């Protein structure tokens, strides 16, 4: 699944000062030979004068072209090729595979370090079952994951959410709710924001994940579940207060 939504990806590219950004479907050029890729895409489509890529870049059908072949093909066309050093983390090259693994294993700090920004979602707020409000006294914001998005490790996270022009410390649970749901219930993403009482339905607030707190488990009573939610929320408040002081 995708790590960033299309909107998040475009915003990050725009923040770098890039004024035009294209993301053509891979199927539209996957069968081109390296030679055709250079002539049809770089020359005919873009009239490219310079190309930048990582040292592990491959192109053309079956990844037949590498950076050396790219230089060979571009040189007689007057296209400059610049090879950019790959980002490193923990002594290894950063890749989407490593980031996905970190998210799926609950290593949110590692994922954030490789992303160079907090992992976040901006899905629309949906109506839930109202259990947080009616039975727990802890109203939650529900932002369920689309089918094509990567779902992080299930569990409870210390998060913060952008609402009404400011960041709010929050606690987020991802997974099935064994205390109140059947075993085959869909996975949910619910966020409790202590002190917030606004209406978020239909909005797309940004929710940042900062720390994995604990696994989801079944409680004997609803009060025990409510206590965990409150404890997690207070830990989130303390966590972000400490970050501001640092």
Place the predicted regions along the sequence by residue:
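Residue-level signal for inorganic ion chemistry
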Residues: 13, 51, 111, 159, ...
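A non-catalytic, amphipathic alpha-helix used as a structural packing/dimerization or gating element
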Residues: 8, 110-117, 224-235
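Phosphate/ribose-recognition catalytic cores of enzymes acting on nucleotide-derived substrates
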Residues: 128-246
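Residues at the C-termini of beta-strands that transition into short coil/loop
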Residues: 25, 85-87, 211
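Glycine-rich, Lys/Arg-enriched anion-binding loops that position phosphate/diphosphate groups
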Residues: 74-175
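N-terminal Rossmann-like or analogous alpha/beta NTP/dinucleotide-binding catalytic cores
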Residues: 1-77
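An acidic, carboxylate-rich microenvironment
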Residues: 8, 36, 69, 98, ...
């Amino acid at each position: 699944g995708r790590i960033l939504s299309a909107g998040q990806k475009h915003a990050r590219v725009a923040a770098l000062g890039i004024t035009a950004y294209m993301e053509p479907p891979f199927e539209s050029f996957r069968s081109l030979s390296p030679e055709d890729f250079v002539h049809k895409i770089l020359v005919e489509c873009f009239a490219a004068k310079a190309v930048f890529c990582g040292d592990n870049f491959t192109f053309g059908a079956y990844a037949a072209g590498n950076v050396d072949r790219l230089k060979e093909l571009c040189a007689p066309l007057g296209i400059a090729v610049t090879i950019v050093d790959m980002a490193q983390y923990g002594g290894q090259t950063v890749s989407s595979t490593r980031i996905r693994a970190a998210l799926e294993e609950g290593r949110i700090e590692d994922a954030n370090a490789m992303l160079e920004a907090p992992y976040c979602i901006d899905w629309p707020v949906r109506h839930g079952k109202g259990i947080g409000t009616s039975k727990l006294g802890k109203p939650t914001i529900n932002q369920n994951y689309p089918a094509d998005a990567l779902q992080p490790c299930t569990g409870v996270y210390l998060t913060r959410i952008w609402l009404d022009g400011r960041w709010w410390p929050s606690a987020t649970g991802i997974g099935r709710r064994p205390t109140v749901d059947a075993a085959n219930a869909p996975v949910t993403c619910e966020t409790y924001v202590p002190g917030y009482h606004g209406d978020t339905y239909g909005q797309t607030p940004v929710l940042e994940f900062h720390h994995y707190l604990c696994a989801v488990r079944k409680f004997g009573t609803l009060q025990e579940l409510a206590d965990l939610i409150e404890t997690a929320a207070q830990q989130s408040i303390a966590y972000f207060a400490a970050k501001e002081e640092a």
